Amino acid sequence: MEKTEGKIRYGLIGIGAQGGSYARFLTNAPAPFPGMVCAPCPDNCALGALCDIDPEKEKMCKEQYPDVPFFKDWKDMIASGTVDAIITTVPHYLHHEISIYAMEHGMNVLCEKPAGVRSKDVQKMIACAKAHPEVSFGIMFNQRTNKLYQKIKEIVASGELGEIRRSQWMINSWWRPDSYYQQSAWRATWGGEGGGVLVNQAPHQLDLWQWICGCLLYTSPSPRD
């Protein structure tokens, strides 16, 4: 695929449920479910390349996106010149490795949440991003695009409710059926996710909580005087 003038070419690493969603979005493909509404892809974005180690995913990608280069090795994709930015939708333990390598090779990076499993790996990733201001780096928290949460943040930020002194975030609608965990072999495994709900669903809620109410200033095991 030749470079499209004025467009950011995205390379997708990992073509599972989430990677497939990105591919459909970047190509303005029809929604996968009847009645589902999908936002149109911005005019300055394009699907540049696809990458996965699964032969079945390779077959599917070549059938659905015959004009898009496919790679089995993400390092080969980064070096190919077919992409300007990458999006990682891979097992959590790989997030920092791929992101750091890509930034060090001049690539813009959008990493799916969570940032990682081990705090030391995440700190390395953050340090790399700071060391390479010439590239853009971000963690994808898609719930921030939800208009409900955007409105809540707007109300809180306006001061309409006064100063937030204490907050409690309760979510009881984020259960997942077994079909969700069967989408990919690495889901709900220590080797793939690195934890349970605190690594899978909870990052969305923790992010929304601090995004809307502000970052935690202190912790205390008992009430302050």
Question: Where are the language model's segments positioned?
Answer:
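Conserved small/polar residues in nucleotide/adenosyl-binding loops
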Residues: 218-225
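Structural signature of beta-strand start/N-cap positions in the alpha/beta core
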Residues: 9, 46, 82-84, 108, ...
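Mid-domain beta-loop-alpha active-site segment that forms a flexible
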Residues: 140-147, 171, 175, 179-217
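Beta-loop-alpha module in the N-terminal Rossmann-like domain of NAD(P)-dependent dehydrogenases
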Residues: 16, 22, 65-128
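N-terminal Rossmann-like dinucleotide-binding module
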Residues: 1-65
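A contiguous active-site-proximal alpha/beta segment in oxidoreductase catalytic domains
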Residues: 116-179, 190
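Short active-site oxyanion
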Residues: 45-49, 84-86, 196
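Short helix-capping segments at alpha-helix termini
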Residues: 31-33, 40-43, 105, 130-135, ...
